[in-house]
Amino acid sequence: MEGNLKNVLVLSFGFLLLFTAYGGLQSLQSSLYSEEGLGVAALSTLYGGMLLSSMFLPPVLIGKLGCKWTLVLAMCCYVAFSLGNFYASWYTLIPASVLVGLGAAALWSAQGTYLTIVGNMQARKTGQVGKDVVSQYFGIFFLIFQSSGVWGNLISSLVFGQMPTQGTIPEEQLQACGASDCLMATLSANSTNRPSQDLIYTLLGIYTGCGFLAVLLMAVFLEPVRDAQPEGEDEKQAPPFWSTLLSTFKLLRDKRLRLLILLPMLSGFEQAFLSGDYTRSYTTCALGIQFVGYVMICFGAADALCSVLFGRLARHTGRTVLFALGAVTQLACIIALLLWKPHPSQLPVFFVFPSLWGMADAVWQTQNNALFGVLFEKNKEAAFANYRLWEALGFVIAFGYSTFLCVSVKLYVLLGVLSAAMAAYGAVEYTESRKADGPLAAGRTKPAEDGATQTKL
């Protein structure tokens, strides 16, 4: 196996192991630690840390440590989060969440930079077009990485499946589930017995082991790389703090970006709702915590499959059709969740919603990044720093108000953000279509550069 492909596979399986652990834990935070809103407070803090670090930390760390050791250091932050869950309290989870937030932006920036460098190295070696090889390597990475949502949630459901079978849930309790839930943000998940501490420790032990394996795999087998510099140029230095910070906000002078910041915020809002509210107020409330993993498997599988499908489909349809599909799908889900009264007798419905949600999320993850890559090609670093910043802000706001609002209100907020984001996107699409080079949608997909393909934590 040639060296560059080996490095891509090492990176991919390292992320698979890491996010098998983190993804499963994130899905359970709001259900396991619902007392006083600790779970959602931890997630809000996490994304707050990411929001701040995304403005300046990634280029500084990558410049000082290189991509490989930035990846290893950032992964250690995720392992610390798993360890913090062993003794979950405000004094352990909140600092651990800050660490993950600080490491997340650096992790994804280093991942994108590394894949771009090895893709271009392979292209020079074989005489291929650079962007084609980079696109191929990103495709391999996400094909492997996206399955982490399946494995992490499968592990949690199998472990918690050892819990004693609970009795019939009282009808009056079911009436408080779903959009009607206004109490479970501050009360324990009362629809199911909390898993025994032994089961929780077993799950955390498995997740922590996956994290340590990821760090070990990257530290031992991933080869360090450096971006090739044109002849006569000095080695590229990490930009100073103020330069990075200012370039991020200076790009907001562009009217198109000011309109498009609603798209990454929507991505943050909708992911936060599914992992923080749907898992707790619909699944845990009506079925039990042991079903959280299974419903999130549907989300992860649908997201992964549709990401691959939409990436190919966009070449033929353009982005506009896919944005419309994502908006209509998410709109239908929001309206249905407002009206639906979850009940254990409707078991298949619990899996349909996250599957459709995953399809819509696949649109936002693939097409938002492609859109930013095309519109702001000359300022891609600042553009994607803005993307990470505004998506993180969406997470922070959504998790921040999670303990204070009824689920129905959160759904109306999400509906408003979706409507505003689509209106803003339509305005940009219309403006671009009037330019001499034709409609933006005709641009098809363009392989993203330097971390421009994924912003998920």
Swiss-Prot record:
Glycosylation site list: N190
SUPFAM superfamilies: MFS general substrate transporter
GO CC list: plasma membrane
Compartmental location: Cell membrane
Alphabetical list of InterPro entries matching this protein: Ion_channel_UNC-93, MFS_trans_sf, UNC-93_regulatory
Pfam families on file: UNC-93
CDD domains referenced in this protein's UniProt entry, alphabetically: MFS_unc93A_like
Principal cellular location given in the protein's record: membrane
Region Disordered, annotated ranges: 438-457
Topology with respect to the bilayer: Multi-pass membrane protein
TM annotation in the entry: 8-28, 42-62, 65-85, 86-106, 140-160, 202-222, 257-277, 291-311, 320-340, 344-364, 395-415
Alphabetical keyword list: Cell membrane, Glycoprotein, Membrane, Transmembrane, Transmembrane helix
Similarity-based family: Belongs to the unc-93 family.
Protein name in UniProt: Protein unc-93 homolog A
Protein species of origin: Bos taurus
Name of the gene this protein is made from: UNC93A
